[in-house]
């Protein structure tokens, strides 16, 4: 049962005790006293859960019995959250004390699903990559990037570890799709589902958080597997989400190019990613069937948001 006016903070963490030691005090300082904080310990081996129990007994800790990765850990934490608004933060994010002041007013609009935060470089205070993400369809695939313009409120996607959202809409959309395991594209997919279902994604540059970008995935997977998972999930993103006949035809036309030239350029990684994605095609189509009942906005209209 959701509790009106309660804010829940969910922080997934794997072997991130050193990051929580650094950033958790700022998280607690920035939240209203009535907020609840949930840390999902993703089967860490660094004593995270015991450290939290000793130093922050009021924080709820979800202890995964095995390593479930980012998406599933977030889903578990959000399912436990009682607040109407959930703030999802990576363990390497350090929010400014007043960052929520410019975020919460956006949720007075019931059509707003999520609000993204303005990420800044923690060293000199200059914006590194911001928090506003856009996308375009090119060469048969959906590519994503962060534009130089980090002041415009319109966005196509937000970072899953640096945003707040309406839990009721999250539940309706189904949360992070585990189709995109073990990592990558789940946050972009969820934002896409929200936009296609008629909801709004907002970027709020005044909501400042410092993001240290200490990549757990790089340590876990290495660069080759990261490229493999990213390409696999890029294909699955198209197969699950794109409904425009023109874009789907374009995807088929460009596939031979990618299967030959992109495979050569990536030293075989794309071909492996394609076959891995193909194995998951039935799952992607099942997921597509589930979410497509909510779709009311065309792909073309979503891509236009990148031009605003």
Task: Walk through the language-model features, giving the residues of each.
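A conserved acidic beta->alpha catalytic loop
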Residues: 26, 41-50, 66, 94
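Short, acidic, metal-binding catalytic loop of nucleotide-sugar glycosyltransferases
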Residues: 25-34
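Conserved donor NDP-sugar-binding/catalytic core segment of glycosyltransferases
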Residues: 93-130
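Short aromatic/hydrophobic "clamp" motif used to bind/position activated sugar donors
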Residues: 86
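A short, conserved alpha-helix in the catalytic core of glycosyltransferases
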Residues: 156-174, 179-212
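Short, flexible, basic/aromatic active-site loop/helix in glycosyltransferases
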Residues: 135-156
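Non-catalytic, C-terminal membrane-associated alpha-helical segments of glycosyltransferases
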Residues: 244-308
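Glycine-rich, basic loop-to-helix element that forms the pyrophosphate-binding segment
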Residues: 64-81, 91, 102
